[in-house]
A protein has these predicted regions:
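FIC/Doc superfamily catalytic core
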Residues: 1-237, 241-298
């Protein structure tokens, strides 16, 4: 964001301006700060204006993501090198084990890959929340594999419930509190949408998907749904895991194989999410997902 000064007669009017991408177009949102302001007044007024602008960007985000035919063809070229493979029963078991381990590890689970395999394949009895959630995520993977449900709020809540029904009192319920994500130093790196706007934003997301699911290539669709879901952050906790399940739900609906985002690549994963949040640029996410596909199906 930057401060823009516009002269009106003898007055100087100050605006905080933010540029962001909607598809391949650059859009701007500005917020009036005042006229003839001192440096001190500017610094005092900027934080609130920045917060308001970011909330406006969150509400727009992919809902203004419209591509021309030429741009759609460009995104198809990005996906073209992918070799689409269909998984057999044993492949699905291996994917479920690896996905469950990695997606939980990204969120801080201490369950090792071998332990996840024992729990899922050998039906060992779980002990503690991490092991219980391992089985919960595995059940959710099985659900997205078999369900015929359309993408809607009920499906999103169902995935959260399957993951956390035995460990979280709010499993399957949209949050009624504000949430932020902090880094290890305590700095806020992401702020979820205001909780009173969450149902409306999820409804917009599902309608956006329904409108574009035939028009846009599958990986682009899945990436946009995943990233926008993470921006909204509709649950009190567990958004990362549900978001990655939604990513795979969309891929499977379009006959693409599921994708496993690896724990060891989590820092790059976080970076592409932040680029999308701040610049509305989906290309880094697409390149990241393609790199994960190549590691998985090489």
């Amino acid at each position: 964001m930057f401060v823009e000064i516009r002269k009106r007669g003898r007055k100087k009017k100050y605006y905080l301006v933010h540029s962001f991408r909607a598809g391949d177009k650059v859009k701007r949102i500005s917020r009036y700060l005042g006229s003839d302001l001192s440096e001190r007044e500017l610094e005092r007024l900027k934080p609130r204006a920045e917060k308001i602008i970011l909330e406006q960007v969150k509400e727009k985000s992919i809902f203004e993501f419209e591509l021309s035919k030429r741009e759609i063809e460009e995104y198809k070229k990005i996906e073209k090198p992918l070799k689409v493979e269909h998984l057999q029963r044993l492949d699905w078991l291996r994917f479920t084990e690896n996905f469950t381990y990695n997606t939980n590890a990204i969120e801080g689970s201490t369950v090792a890959l071998d332990e996840a395999k024992d729990l899922i394949e050998h039906k060992e009895k779980p002990h503690g929340a991490d092991e219980i959630e391992t089985l919960g995520v595995a059940n959710a993977v099985e659900y997205i594999r078999k369900t015929r449900s359309k993408l809607n709020i009920s499906l999103i809540k169902k995935l959260h419930f399957l993951c956390f029904e035995k460990t979280k009192s709010f499993a399957g319920k949209l949050r009624n509190v504000e949430v932020v994500i902090r880094d290890r130093y305590g700095n806020i790196v992401h702020q979820g949408a205001p909780y009173n706007k969450v149902p409306k934003l999820l409804e917009k997301l599902t309608k956006w998907y329904a409108k574009h699911k035939i028009k846009y290539p599958p990986l682009l669709l899945a990436a946009l749904v995943h990233n926008e879901f993470e921006n909204i952050h509709p649950f009190q906790d567990g958004n990362g895991r549900v978001g990655r399940l939604l990513l795979n739900y969309v891929l499977l609906k379009h006959s693409y194989p599921p994708i496993n985002i690896r724990f060891k690549d989590r820092q790059r994963y976080y970076r592409v999410l932040q680029i999308f949040e701040k610049k509305n640029d989906i290309k880094p996410t697409l390149r990241f997902l393609i790199s994960q596909y190549k590691k998985q199906y090489r």
